[in-house]
From Swiss-Prot:
Organism field: Rattus norvegicus (Rat)
InterPro entries found in the cross-reference section: CD80_C2-set, Ig-like_dom, Ig-like_dom_sf, Ig-like_fold, Ig_sub, Ig_sub2, Ig_V-set, Neurexin-like
Name the record gives this protein: Cell adhesion molecule 1
Keyword Oxidoreductase annotated: no
Gene name for this UniProt entry: Cadm1
Disulfide bonds: 67-127, 169-223, 270-316
Domain of life: Eukaryota
Amino acid sequence: MASPVLPSGSQCAAAAAVAAAAAPPGLRLRLLLLLLSAAALIPTGDGQNLFTKDVTVIEGEVATISCQVNKSDDSVIQLLNPNRQTIYFRDFRPLKDSRFQLLNFSSSELKVSLTNVSISDEGRYFCQLYTDPPQESYTTITVLVPPRNLMIDIQKDTAVEGEEIEVNCTAMASKPATTIRWFKGNKELKGKSEVEEWSDMYTVTSQLMLKVHKEDDGVPVICQVEHPAVTGNLQTQRYLEVQYKPQVQIQMTYPLQGLTREGDAFELTCEATGKPQPVMVTWVRVDDEMPQHAVLSGPNLFINNLNKTDNGTYRCEASNTVGKAHSDYMLYVYDPPTTIPPPTTTTTTTTTTTTTTTILTIITDTTATTEPAVHGLTQLPNSAEELDSEDLSDSRAGEEGAIGAVDHAVIGGVVAVVVFAMLCLLIILGRYFARHKGTYFTHEAKGADDAADADTAIINAEGGQNNSEEKKEYFI
């Protein structure tokens, strides 16, 4: 700002100021005040060479005041407080306040520090330069005071879902007034603020009306302060506690594939969450009674051996002190699956066995006497083939009627083996008897004295079979 300039011919005033500095302390102060009063009456002129800067400082920190001269002519510089009391005259400090310390003194600058700044130190400080004419400039010290206390208060410690609650935040004794911002989690909300001023200090109270939901349970409500004396984030917070009615969900735990058929087992589990935790979970069947074979165990519903009569809607109900809720499950029982056997390929190996059966035939000539004659052995392979063919036909018929039945095939094979063994046994026995058995007369004749005649009779019987008249009978 512009400084008052002394008129020409007033060098005596500067000399008087120098003399006042050398006078005793009590007289010195009076002379300086008189000199300053006289200088203030001098009209303003041009040629300002004295400069200062405003200072902003946080309470408790250090403020630096500097009086600078642009074009120095070795004139006297002094610093005064808002009450016009001299703090420093050149490098001399008349004021008995040790918080003021001289940092630099020269013909072009007077720099002074003020430690532990308080709100009472705020105001205008004057720099004076005793030139011809004298000059004066001032600097303003602004003291910032951060909030001394930050408090948040919730109307209700525990809220119920759907309620609207009041939350207040107070920032006390700040300068200037603070700005309060609200956050719920990461979402910013808008509140209403009121400011109270007392002794140049400000108290700000912000009110937030908040409607809570179950999702807000455990979410912090943050009161954040913005102030020039505060670096970073100054904030306080409270966590919401919201009670809400149960949330019910039904899970089918069996069968795992999710398809219910007749004869299957069936199980449902009811999951209920809430605040406070639900104290009662019950199962009911909507519009009908619960099946008698249904088993209820806490949150679980179990039905064994499902049938069509179990179709319907099953409801799980849960409740707490806030309220109750339910969830429904519609059961539909499907028909049991139809079992179709997979196609099988049966390979049948047919073995044809030709059996030759030897039958012993004894022919007795009815035209002769009672002596029998053995004509020989006759083989009838055709009869064996017919018998084998019948067995084979029966075997094939059995196989066609029992495709896929392994037991029947095994039994048929065993029977065939037994039949074959019996036929072989008959053949062996037939051959045996054919070789060792003759007629009664033949054996008796061979045992007598005239065995030779008996042999002749046998030969005649074998050789003369075509002519009955030539047959001769011998009686032994």
